[in-house]
Amino acid sequence: MIVLSIVCIGIIVGYYYYLTYRDKKDIENSTELTKVGEVLAKDLEKDYPPTPREVIKFYDKILKCYYNEEYEQEELEEMADQARLLMDEELLKKNPKDQYMLMLEADIKNYKDNERKLVDTTVCDSKEVEYKKVDGRECAYVVSRYFVREGNTYSNTSQKYVLRKDEDGNWKILGFKMVEGESSDD
């Protein structure tokens, strides 16, 4: 009987130790981030996307978070700051942060009010990126395609982004032109 009691106490103590240790280990190893968390965790000052295509891929990731994910107002502002770090000084001057935030919030509200979802984004292949010199500065043209669902209607939209290399050698978004695609009912 004493041996059985000692074994039971040992099992209880061992189980308690296991639960205590496991919880701490899980918290320490819990590096899974939400999509919003991934966007906010990227340090663009240390790890700026190296190519025009990668800049647009990260920008598209931000767009998907804007339109598809749940987040707090503070996180929206931080995501907007990340997006603005990808923009050329000329574009930033034309869109001061307060104005940018007002337009962004209105656009997101419209998107959600119409129950739209940004289903997928696709950036053109590297070989499809066009490089040109404009006014003595290196520019790149990158096309990104957006697949959007609104109810039972799907639409494809393409945007052609113009990026310009800054004095640090980083590609920054100077502007874009949207081209509407066809819609289909399913």
Q: Which functions belong to the PLM regions below?
A:
Residues 34-115:
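Core segments of small alpha/beta cavity-forming domains
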Residues 2-3, 81-86, 158:
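Short, charged low-complexity linear motifs
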Residues 100, 135, 144-148, 161, ...:
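A mature extracytoplasmic/lumenal domain signature
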Residues 55, 140, 157-159:
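Hydrophobic core residues within well-ordered beta-strands of beta-rich domains
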Residues 104-150:
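Surface-exposed, charged secondary-structure patches
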Residues 12-18, 39-40, 93-100, 115-120, ...:
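Short low-complexity stretches enriched in small and charged residues
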Residues 24-34, 154-186:
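Short beta-strand edge/turn micro-motifs at domain boundaries
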Residues 1-37:
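Amphipathic, hydrophobic N-terminal targeting peptides for secretion and organelle import
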